[in-house]
Amino acid sequence: LGYIILKLNSMEKIRILGRHNLQLKGKVKISGAKNSVLPTIAASLLTEEKIQLKNVPLVKDVFTILTLMQELGAEYELDNDSLSIQVKRIRSEEASYELVRAMRASILVLGPLLARHGKAVVSLPGGCAIGSRPTDLHIHGLEKLGASVNLEHGYIKAEAKSLEGTIIEFEKKTVGGTENLVMTASLSHGETILKNCSLEPEVSDLCELLLKMGAKIEGIGEETIRIIGVKELGGASHNIIPDRIEASTFLIAGALTEGDIVLTHIKADHFDTIVEKLKFSGAKIDKLDDNSLRVIGSQEIKAQDITTSSYPGFPTDIQAPFTTLMTQAEGTSIITETIFDRRFSHVNELLRLGANIEILGDKAIVKGKSLLSGAEIIATDLRAAAALVLAGLVASGETVISGAGHLDRGYEKFEEKLNSLGADIKRLEE
């Protein structure tokens, strides 16, 4: 049933009735991390035994990777937020363009398929329309482990008789590359040392699952990770960490609307950077306990500059929602995007709502405060969609967003959660 509900067209529309003095108030439960569950699902390819995951968010990307996993030979059962998945044998080594195009994270099956099956054929990714995300770092690493990799007709074809441990230094930080190579090295011969690894909590979460499966990994959460390959991995149960990007989005919603929101089921130390920035802009944020925070927005939002960078820096996934917040701040902010090129698709749409923003290369110069008014706008990717929903909340009158289905890729019950806090958002039937 979940699959049917979530097989949504990304061109769906949502209507928001906003107002300048909207205050969001209440409690919201944060879901499991999308960017953690995708690699952990891919990791089930490394064993014949069953992997059980809890706190799984029911978002479209999860259903996309599960469809891909079924094609590769997986059987799964999904019950609310609990997923049981098993790949007794690999039925196909090909991840087709149709599915990889729908979600770039499908590249995460490349390493596990190769490590267990000796060959993998994975389409070059499509996914979000936000600039280039090179797969070269993944390919280079697999070659160093002894795989022969060719690019043919839009597919990455990798083969290896055996994979031998080695030292691999990533040219630049890569979350997917780190994840792919940690998984592959877990079933390689001997010792692999990965240098300049990504520090994201989602990478650590994957490593924690691999440990439970029997992998030998040292340096989890550090820039240098050491893996001693084992002959085989087994089944395991694992709780997915909370989604720090969803949590950050709701913190911004509270700050933006002079709201009073309590977030539960979180890991507060996973988004310290956002908390610091929001406090600087005037929000009051209190830690209630290890798993909950309260945000109280202030009447005056203070402008500030941000520069995106890899964890523990300011996350690129929160750049668009933060830009919306800065349209309501007094003064000028400079938002610099260093991770992805072309990640300013939300800006033209914010202009339609009345924002004052100028793009100069990798910078967006936001002049506030702008009184926003509702209009018809379009979202081209997941985080842009979230930013535009937030803008619609504080724009007077009706805002209709096309491309709202992008939200379903990464936010579980986004409108429902916002409506429970006092928003007025409705999905429109095409």
Task: Specify the residue positions occupied by each region the protein language model found.
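Short, structured segments at the rim of ligand-binding sites
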Residues: 2-430
